[in-house]
From Swiss-Prot:
Principal cellular location given in the protein's record: host cell
Protein name stated in the entry: Glyco-Gag protein
Key words of the record: Glycoprotein, Host cell membrane, Host membrane, Membrane, Transmembrane, Transmembrane helix
Composition skew (Low complexity), residue ranges: 194-206
Membrane topology: Single-pass membrane protein
InterPro entries: G_retro_matrix (IPR000840), G_retro_matrix_sf (IPR036946), Gag_p12 (IPR002079), Gag_P30 (IPR003036), Retrov_capsid_N (IPR008919), Retroviral_Gag-Pol_poly (IPR050462), Retrovr_matrix (IPR010999)
Topology feature Extracellular, residues: 73-414
SUPFAM superfamilies listed in its UniProt record: Retroviral matrix proteins, Retrovirus capsid protein, N-terminal core domain
């Protein structure tokens, strides 16, 4: 019997049969009997196919877990860009735009930054930038006169500039480094000059003979001879002039000529309200050239009210004019009848305490006055009055642009 048992053991070893299976088939030399569950586990453990199945099950569980952990780590280390910063702080961006009297939309904000401003070919990156040079290049395209401009994009580029010039705490680390100051050219070293030779008689420079004056030598004449080479000397202020008979008033032409000589023309600064020292706003009125260019390069209000309304909207947003500047702008770009219609439509939109248009005359006169108010733009209250006034003026322009149908013209066509 022992020989049979040893033969069975050798056969079981050669064919990969475990001792547990030998016990199940009745081999007495296989040792003590075990339970069915212990036998099944031992068979699964020693079988190569069973080990492979267990490995695949463990791997199918671990691989998704590791993939999820790696993805979370990579997403946590995503590089922030100016565009992503503004989207993460969108509530602050909208509040900044609202304080300037404009509204911005998140979807259009992304479209302009990633597509339209990039296609302007002015160096604007898809991820956005807080560089004032890039913002200025985009502004030139947006504020281009006539059909080449983009008035609908004015609120967005204005908000970008506001974030760059007055950055909040989350923008400051992403501002471009300031440009190094341009070094001043070093003065050239003086070249050694030849020794001076003395002469008994100095050599006088040749002078051209004086030109005869075009105008008669009348000292009391207010006109100035513009053909002479040198301007006449102007008396300095050495004290009060002696009392005596007053000289006749100079003509307007002579006055303008003298003012041009005495006060050279300065460069035009078409920014009525600008920040000065200590963040205090300074006043710069419109120049005549600005008003002339706006009027000559745009159609009249009666011909294309939408285009002129968009122009005035961009001026109101970027220049932030005072009450006087708004009247000057309306007088330059609109006729008398058009101004009356715009002011009437604007006064209809004055909000009351409940936010709806009111009909109380005192509230209307206080919010949208027809006479010059006492609003100080250097104070927050004055700037708030001006902001609401500009919004109502823009609403009046849009209301006046909806002209009623001329029934006489319709009858002629029929």
């Amino acid at each position: 019997m022992s020989g049979a048992s040893s033969g069975t053991a050798i056969g079981a070893h050669l064919f990969g049969v475990s001792p547990e299976c030998r016990v199940l088939i009745g081999d007495e030399g296989a040792g003590p009997s075990k339970s069915l569950s212990e036998v099944s586990f031992s068979v699964w453990y020693q079988s190569r196919a069973a080990r492979l199945v267990i490995f695949c099950l463990v791997a199918s569980f671990l691989v998704p877990c590791l993939t999820f952990l790696i993805a979370e780590t990579v997403m946590g280390q995503t590089i922030a860009t100016p565009l992503s910063l503004t989207l993460d702080h969108w509530s602050e961006v909208r509040a900044r735009a609202h304080n300037q009297g404009v509204e911005v939309r998140k979807k259009k904000w992304v479209t302009l930054c990633e597509a339209e401003w990039v296609m302007m070919n002015v160096g604007w990156p898809r991820e956005g930038t807080f560089s004032l040079d890039n913002i200025s290049q985009v502004e030139k395209k947006i504020f281009a006169p006539g059909p080449y401009g983009h008035p609908d994009q004015v609120p967005y580029i204005t908000t970008w500039r506001s974030l760059a010039t007055d950055p909040p705490s989350w923008v400051r680390p992403f501002l471009p480094p300031p440009k190094p100051p341009t070094p001043l050219p070093q003065p050239l070293s003086p070249q050694p000059s030849a020794p001076l030779t003395s002469s008994l008689y100095p050599v006088l420079p040749k002078t051209d003979p004086p030109k005869p004056p075009v105008l008669p030598p009348d000292p009391s004449s207010p006109l100035i001879d513009l053909l002479t080479e040198e301007p006449p000397p102007y008396p300095g202020g050495h004290g009060p002039l002696p009392s005596g008979p007053r000289t006749p008033t100079a003509s307007p032409i002579a006055s303008r000529l003298r003012e041009r000589r005495e006060n050279p023309a300065e460069e035009s600064q078409a920014l009525p309200l600008r920040e000065g020292p200590n963040n205090r706003p300074q006043y710069w009125p419109f120049s005549a050239s600005d008003l002339y260019n706006w009027k000559s390069h745009n159609p009249p209000f009666s011909q294309d009210p939408v285009a002129l309304t968009n122009l005035i909207e961009s001026i109101l947003v970027t220049h932030q004019p005072t009450w006087d500047d708004c009247q000057q702008l309306l007088q330059a770009l609109l006729t008398g009848e058009e101004r009356q219609r715009v002011l009437l439509e604007a006064r209809k939109q004055v909000p009351g305490e409940d936010g709806r248009p009111t009909q109380l005359p005192n509230v209307i006169d206080e919010t949208f006055p027809l006479t010059r108010p006492n609003w100080d733009f250097a104070t927050p209250a004055g700037r708030e009055h001006l902001r609401l006034y500009r919004q109502l003026l823009l609403a009046g322009l849009r209301g006046a642009a909806r002209r009623p149908t001329n029934l006489a013209q319709v009858k002629q066509v029929v």
